[in-house]
Amino acid sequence: MAAKIRKGDKVIVLTGRDKGRTGEVFEVRPDAGTALVRGINLVKRHQKQTQNQEGGIITKEAPIHLSNVAYVGKDGKPTRIGFKVQADGKKVRVAKSSGVEIDG
């Protein structure tokens, strides 16, 4: 399946404790259907001390399912994403609400 949400996209969280917050996607995991969004879904993890790293409790982003985030368009509103094939055969992402091309 083609990736509707990609690295670098600005997204808004639709459900959960971070509902309504926006952030930038910095990693997408297509096999799991999840993404990591900067500053969203933060969890605390106990880190064991190593030679390179100090031990203690660290805060990091946990994966969030792609169905729980929506792309934020140029107008600042969440929108669904579709695909359109251009005349030269190139496939581009399109915002469903406005019809504006996202990339390409």
From Swiss-Prot:
One of its GO terms (molecular function) is structural constituent of ribosome. The keyword Cell inner membrane does not apply. GO terms for biological process: translation. SUPFAM superfamilies: Translation proteins SH3-like domain. GO terms for cellular component: ribonucleoprotein complex; ribosome. PANTHER family: MITOCHONDRIAL RIBOSOMAL PROTEIN L24 (PTHR12903). One of two assembly initiator proteins, it binds directly to the 5'-end of the 23S rRNA, where it nucleates assembly of the 50S subunit. This is Large ribosomal subunit protein uL24. It comes from Bradyrhizobium sp. (strain BTAi1 / ATCC BAA-1182). The gene is rplX.
